[in-house]
Amino acid sequence: MSDWERNHPEQLGTVQTERLPAPPAPPRQENLIEFYVGPTATFRYFIDAASLTVLYKQKEVRYVLVARSPSGADNVSFEAIRCPDMHRIYAVGDASKWSERSGGWQEIQRRTGVGVPGVLAREYFCPHRDTLQSAAEGVDALRRGGHPLVFTAPRNLGL
């Protein structure tokens, strides 16, 4: 099966059902790593380092995202990026429970860089459009403020 077939089953005439992964434990404050989304972001964004998982063969990076409002309220979601350009929300929740989301994979608009999935894919989790080798590599990229390989790519090619 090609990548296109795997990412667009609804266009094949038969919809394939994907088994949803079990959500990780709720995030803990000491495991949150803040990352920069852009100058117009009103929320602060964090990845729970303990939840970061890399499935290299599937080209998938799973993580818990915390979006903190200016008032301090947290929106928590269990998400994934399928490198280089697909995104999915598996579940949303709070500190005590998760609620599964039934939506499938959505394309990331990488060239515009709009939105959290685009920033995570481009700057942290899909360097040179490839998947991270390990969760430790992703945690390192978050702590550095970006993946070191990203900054060597020519910016004028729309990567």
Placement of each model-derived feature along the sequence:
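Mature, folded catalytic cores of secreted/periplasmic enzymes
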Residues: 40, 88, 157-159
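N-terminal trafficking/processing presequences and adjacent post-cleavage segments
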Residues: 1-32, 113-159
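Generic alpha-helical secondary structure signal
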Residues: 39, 49, 67, 109, ...
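Generic marker of "main functional regions" within proteins
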Residues: 11-14, 42-47, 73, 86, ...
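An exposed acidic His-Trp-rich patch
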Residues: 71-132
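Aromatic-residue detector
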Residues: 60-72, 96-101, 106, 140-156
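N-terminal secretory signal peptides
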Residues: 1-74, 78
